[in-house]
């Protein structure tokens, strides 16, 4: 009976079948590692792109904010410069106008200072008693009011005759005078005469009624004086038997003379 001895090569081959070699294990590990590397590479690229996007966005935002700030500063500077220029222009115009007024005033003063004495009107000819020449006044004041000769003189051109009698008045008190006008229809009463008489203690003035004064005809004569126009009014009363004019009583409401 014979026994067969196994071949060591076959045994080696059998064991190599169950236990892979180093080359086979390296090939299997290479196939397992490749997807991990690809995934990590993709993740890294995504992260890098995200960081780049964030950095670029922040830079762009900072640039826009800087441009907007610079634009706002430029606009404010331009507005301030325009406002300052307008204010300077206004001050220049105001100064020019004030300088023009000052120049006009100074030129007027210089003209007045440098003008000769012939340009000035002649001085007033005032006499010792205070009278002023009418011709000088007429030359100096062409629009002056008319004088006495122009109103009541022989060549009167501006005659003015009052249409009604002036109301009664008094410098001290007008109430008794007004009370007396209501009694004008009842004639002259002693009470009214006593009210009209004022004591000299009241400022040194006293009123005298027109009834106590002589008429105009008794003082100046019956005929009108030469150089005066007759005033409208009642005719002088009839003369008495002695040749003296009969005094006519003035109306009770006539004016009072202050003496």
Curated annotation (Swiss-Prot):
It comes from Homo sapiens (Human). Its main location: membrane. The gene is BEAN1. This is Protein BEAN1. It is linked to Spinocerebellar ataxia 31: A form of spinocerebellar ataxia, a clinically and genetically heterogeneous group of cerebellar disorders. Patients show progressive incoordination of gait and often poor coordination of hands, speech and eye movements, due to degeneration of the cerebellum with variable involvement of the brainstem and spinal cord. SCA31 belongs to the autosomal dominant cerebellar ataxias type III (ADCA III) which are characterized by pure cerebellar ataxia without additional signs. It comes from the Eukaryota. GO terms for cellular component: membrane. The chain crosses the membrane at residues 36-56. PANTHER family: PROTEIN BEAN1. It is a single-pass membrane protein. Keywords: Membrane, Neurodegeneration, Spinocerebellar ataxia, Transmembrane, Transmembrane helix.
